[in-house]
Amino acid sequence: MLERAQRTLRREVRYSGVGIHFGKSATITLEPAKENTGIVFCRSDLLGEHIPALLPHVCNTGRSTTLSSGDSIIATVEHLMAALRSSNIDNVIVRCDEEEIPIGDGSSHVFMQLIHDAGVCTQNDKVSIARLSQPVYYQAQDTFLAAFPCDELKISYTLHYPQSPTIGTQYRSFVITEESFRKEIAPCRTFALYNELCFLMERGLIGGGCLENAVVFKDDGVISLGQLRFPDEPVRHKILDLIGDLSLVGRPFVAHIVAVGSGHSSNIALGRKILEVLQP
């Protein structure tokens, strides 16, 4: 059985910013937590309502992943969750004074920096690294995901955007480690198509969206502050989202994840299937 020491932050750290969808200023505080706490969100503006970062608490997957407990919600958790899970942080309290996690620059970069600033310490209790007892898959229309037994966490993703010549078809495959995530995935920003913007705004989304936290793709080019961080930044960001969503399984695991055109809803659906076949 694979196992390692549980990990938490060495000290408390704080970050303030704007939520990309609701457009509200928010402050998050990451606090060290004792062994076997897990990752828990806490709405500091609502008498400390606790929301565990687990699949049963997912309540919405429209353009981001939202968790809830009782009447409390916490939205757009995936970029922070990807950073915590890729850094092997098992136990942390995330306090937020609003209903949405700040978006930063649209990537996981700010959260990786927070973890670096806080420092990481090992704890006395161990955590087992789960494996898949059998392959599982999820398919819906043009979306396909599968998870295969593997000795490491590997993600292979195909992004196909025929409606956007500037994105087209992109493919990347990474073995996910703290280093590969930090260098190859964490800097990659969320993106949208130019012709989607009105639709998103009509739905009350991207209220805090701007070129400081997103990349916009037009048929004839890219609207961005500076150049793309990678030529295939969109597919890398999709991998980032997938890591964040699958972290809601609630325990570290190894598998080879193969994804074609997945989003938050299908990522969560695969996560639920993975949870059914994890061992030990």
Curated annotation (Swiss-Prot):
GO molecular function, one term: UDP-3-O-acyl-N-acetylglucosamine deacetylase activity
GO cellular component terms given for this protein: membrane
Active site (catalytic residues): H264 (proton donor)
InterPro entries: Ribosomal_Su5_D2-typ_SF, UDP-acyl_GlcNac_deAcase, UDP-acyl_GlcNac_deAcase_C, UDP-acyl_N-AcGlcN_deAcase_N
Catalyzed reactions per annotation: a UDP-3-O-[(3R)-3-hydroxyacyl]-N-acetyl-alpha-D-glucosamine + H2O = a UDP-3-O-[(3R)-3-hydroxyacyl]-alpha-D-glucosamine + acetate
Keywords: Hydrolase, Lipid A biosynthesis, Lipid biosynthesis, Lipid metabolism, Metal-binding, Zinc
Cofactor: Zn(2+)
Enzyme Commission code(s) on record: 3.5.1.108
One record GO biological process: lipid A biosynthetic process
Binding site for Zn(2+): H79, H237, D241
UniProt cross-references to Pfam families, sorted A to Z: LpxC
Function: Catalyzes the hydrolysis of UDP-3-O-myristoyl-N-acetylglucosamine to form UDP-3-O-myristoylglucosamine and acetate, the committed step in lipid A biosynthesis.
NCBIfam families named in the record: lpxC (TIGR00325)
Annotated family: Belongs to the LpxC family.
Protein name as it appears in the record: UDP-3-O-acyl-N-acetylglucosamine deacetylase
Provenance organism: Chlamydia abortus (strain DSM 27085 / S26/3)
